[in-house]
């Protein structure tokens, strides 16, 4: 069995928060695949289904973000799962909006939901070696702005990339069931149009790259290139005198 946990805070007031992007991903997986109805168990909303022959349990902890580990640990103990059977989906400040990364193990990066899960995973064989799917939401630019930023709603301008990302995650979730994490990340990057992007989401026209302007030259080099060559006579008395001075032979 694969347990996919999306992190967030319960309640309609938090539904569209950046901090709830994990819940959003779980909801989209639920909508695009055949799952049982949501039910309340393990201090969470859960739904079970089968993806690519693998039984999958979706979990949305209802404990609030900072206690997410209580719910996930309870579900894992009930089904006798190990950290290798767990994928956690959550928001990442240090990735630009729309970027996705998956890694097995690692630190919490200051994320309180991950801190809670890490603490509860210590009692399982394999400890903190579960898969972490980080979904980029961007950073507000200053530490003191982070709290209000993550608990703020996504802007309308974010809807296009957010809908594309959620759809791509849900459509390719079978790769997670097959443990094909690198292929999954590549598929998401293609869906998000990352192939020809500069930082900041500005797409690069390949034609512009082919016609890149020449490197700038220093003013000294330009002066040398523009300097006229001296007009040296090839015959006559002056030419003969120059040959003697320069030691030039006929």
From Swiss-Prot:
Main localization, broad class: cytoplasm
UniProt site positions, description: Stabilizes the basic form of H active site to accept a proton: 91
Gene from which the chain derives: pth
A Pfam match: Pept_tRNA_hydro
Entry protein name: Peptidyl-tRNA hydrolase
UniProt GO cellular component terms: cytoplasm
Keyword RNA-binding: yes
Residue pairs linked by disulfide bridges in the UniProt entry: none
Stretches that traverse the bilayer: none
Function: Hydrolyzes ribosome-free peptidyl-tRNAs (with 1 or more amino acids incorporated), which drop off the ribosome during protein synthesis, or as a result of ribosome stalling.
Family according to the record: Belongs to the PTH family.
The keyword Hydrolase is annotated on this UniProt entry: yes
